[in-house]
Amino acid sequence: MGKTIRFGVSLDSDLLEKFDKLCDEKSYQTRSEAIRDLIRNMLVEKEWDEADGQMAGTLSLVYDHHQSGLSQRLTELQHDSHDLIMSTLHVHLDHDNCLEVMVLKGDGKQIKELAHRLISTKGVKHGKLGLTTTGEELV
C-alpha cells in the first residue's frame, strides 16, 4: 500500500449534504473512507468492463432538459452510434428532469465508449451502464 495523499474535492453544497447523510447511514467514520470505497468500486467496475465481444445492456441517463443544448448534444451522440442503440425510452420525471433509457447491443468496447461519452456529457446528472450477455454463448 502506498502513502496517503490528501487532495481537495469541490462539491455543490446540496450534493455534499446528501453525501454526508449517506455516509452516516452507511456508518462511515469519515468522508475519506466513503470516497475511498467509491473509488475502489469504480476500479472494480473497470475490471469487469474490460471484457470484449458482443454484449447487450442498458444505459440510463438523468438530466435537466432545460440545460442549454444538452438534449441536442445527447441526441447527436446517439445518432452517431445508431447501430448500437436498439431502442430508447424517454420519461419526463418532473418539470425539469428527464430519464432516458437506451437498450444497447453490439461490440462491448463500442458500447462502453458510447456510454462513457454520454455519461460524461456536461449536464448529465447521473448515468449508469448495465451490461449483460446476448445469450448466444449460454447453454
Curated annotation (Swiss-Prot):
Binds 1 nickel ion per subunit. It comes from the Bacteria. Keywords: DNA-binding, Metal-binding, Nickel, Transcription, Transcription regulation. SUPFAM superfamilies: ACT-like, Ribbon-helix-helix. Gene3D superfamilies: ACT-like. Chain A, domain 2 (3.30.70.1150), Met repressor-like (1.10.1220.10). Its cofactor is Ni(2+). Ni(2+) binds at H79, H90, H92, C98. Pfam families: NikR_C, RHH_1. This is Putative nickel-responsive regulator. It comes from Maridesulfovibrio salexigens (strain ATCC 14822 / DSM 2638 / NCIMB 8403 / VKM B-1763). The lineage of its organism: Bacteria, Pseudomonadati, Thermodesulfobacteriota, Desulfovibrionia, Desulfovibrionales.
